[in-house]
Amino acid sequence: MKKLIYILTISILAISCNTKDNYIQEVYVNEYVNLSLPEYSEIAISGSAIFIEGGVEGIIIYHGVGNDYKVYDRNCSYQPSLSCSVIDSVNSGIAFCGCCTSAFLI
Protein backbone atom coordinates (compact mmCIF):
# COMPACT_ATOMS: atom_id res chain seq x y z
CA MET A 1 0.00 0.00 0.00
CA LYS A 2 2.85 2.38 0.84
CA LYS A 3 4.44 1.64 -2.54
CA LEU A 4 1.19 2.51 -4.31
CA ILE A 5 0.90 5.84 -2.49
CA TYR A 6 4.55 6.59 -3.22
CA ILE A 7 4.15 5.76 -6.93
CA LEU A 8 0.95 7.83 -7.20
CA THR A 9 2.59 10.81 -5.50
CA ILE A 10 5.64 10.69 -7.77
CA SER A 11 3.41 10.25 -10.84
CA ILE A 12 1.25 13.25 -9.95
CA LEU A 13 4.32 15.40 -9.32
CA ALA A 14 5.91 14.34 -12.62
CA ILE A 15 2.73 15.00 -14.61
CA SER A 16 2.16 18.40 -13.02
CA CYS A 17 5.62 19.72 -13.93
CA ASN A 18 5.50 22.57 -16.41
CA THR A 19 8.03 22.40 -19.23
CA LYS A 20 7.57 26.07 -20.18
CA ASP A 21 10.66 28.09 -19.30
CA ASN A 22 9.79 31.42 -17.73
CA TYR A 23 13.14 33.13 -17.39
CA ILE A 24 15.14 35.89 -19.02
CA GLN A 25 17.82 34.70 -21.41
CA GLU A 26 21.44 35.21 -20.46
CA VAL A 27 22.94 37.59 -23.00
CA TYR A 28 26.50 38.88 -22.96
CA VAL A 29 26.53 42.68 -23.09
CA ASN A 30 29.65 44.72 -23.68
CA GLU A 31 28.67 48.29 -24.54
CA TYR A 32 30.60 51.51 -24.36
CA VAL A 33 28.51 54.67 -24.22
CA ASN A 34 30.20 58.04 -24.52
CA LEU A 35 27.88 60.19 -22.40
CA SER A 36 29.37 63.40 -23.80
CA LEU A 37 27.84 62.74 -27.25
CA PRO A 38 24.76 64.85 -28.13
CA GLU A 39 22.43 61.84 -28.55
CA TYR A 40 22.95 61.00 -24.86
CA SER A 41 22.59 64.55 -23.54
CA GLU A 42 19.24 63.85 -21.88
CA ILE A 43 20.91 61.46 -19.39
CA ALA A 44 23.01 64.31 -17.94
CA ILE A 45 20.22 65.13 -15.46
CA SER A 46 19.92 63.02 -12.29
CA GLY A 47 16.80 60.86 -12.37
CA SER A 48 16.73 60.57 -16.16
CA ALA A 49 16.99 57.43 -18.27
CA ILE A 50 17.67 56.50 -21.88
CA PHE A 51 17.00 53.36 -23.89
CA ILE A 52 19.66 51.90 -26.20
CA GLU A 53 20.03 48.75 -28.31
CA GLY A 54 21.47 45.59 -26.73
CA GLY A 55 20.62 42.90 -24.22
CA VAL A 56 17.44 40.85 -24.62
CA GLU A 57 14.91 43.64 -25.27
CA GLY A 58 17.17 46.68 -25.10
CA ILE A 59 19.08 48.42 -22.34
CA ILE A 60 18.05 51.12 -19.87
CA ILE A 61 20.76 53.47 -18.61
CA TYR A 62 19.54 55.31 -15.51
CA HIS A 63 21.35 58.31 -14.01
CA GLY A 64 20.99 58.26 -10.24
CA VAL A 65 22.46 60.81 -7.84
CA GLY A 66 25.85 62.33 -8.70
CA ASN A 67 27.94 60.05 -10.90
CA ASP A 68 25.82 56.98 -10.13
CA TYR A 69 24.70 55.25 -13.34
CA LYS A 70 22.78 51.98 -13.38
CA VAL A 71 22.14 49.70 -16.35
CA TYR A 72 19.19 47.31 -16.71
CA ASP A 73 17.75 45.09 -19.41
CA ARG A 74 14.37 46.28 -20.72
CA ASN A 75 12.88 42.77 -20.54
CA CYS A 76 10.27 42.74 -17.75
CA SER A 77 11.29 40.21 -15.10
CA TYR A 78 7.73 39.52 -13.89
CA GLN A 79 6.48 37.75 -17.04
CA PRO A 80 9.52 37.62 -19.35
CA SER A 81 8.03 35.05 -21.73
CA LEU A 82 5.35 37.45 -23.03
CA SER A 83 6.29 39.15 -26.30
CA CYS A 84 5.03 42.52 -25.03
CA SER A 85 6.95 42.22 -21.74
CA VAL A 86 9.21 45.26 -22.15
CA ILE A 87 9.91 48.20 -19.84
CA ASP A 88 8.55 51.11 -21.84
CA SER A 89 8.99 54.09 -19.52
CA VAL A 90 11.02 55.29 -16.54
CA ASN A 91 9.71 58.10 -14.34
CA SER A 92 11.29 59.30 -11.08
CA GLY A 93 13.34 56.14 -10.62
CA ILE A 94 10.45 53.75 -11.31
CA ALA A 95 10.45 51.57 -14.44
CA PHE A 96 7.06 50.58 -15.85
CA CYS A 97 6.03 47.62 -18.01
CA GLY A 98 3.01 48.50 -20.15
CA CYS A 99 2.20 44.83 -20.78
CA CYS A 100 1.68 43.44 -17.28
CA THR A 101 1.56 46.85 -15.51
CA SER A 102 4.51 45.97 -13.28
CA ALA A 103 6.54 48.76 -11.67
CA PHE A 104 10.16 48.40 -10.56
CA LEU A 105 12.13 50.71 -8.29
CA ILE A 106 15.48 51.28 -9.97
Which residues are covered by each model-predicted region?
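Compact Cys/His-rich metal-coordination microdomains
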Residues: 95-97
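Sec-dependent signal peptide recognition
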Residues: 2-7
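C-terminal motif of bacterial Sec signal peptides marking the signal peptidase cleavage site
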Residues: 13-16
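N-terminal pre-ligand scaffold of iron-sulfur
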Residues: 18-92, 103-106
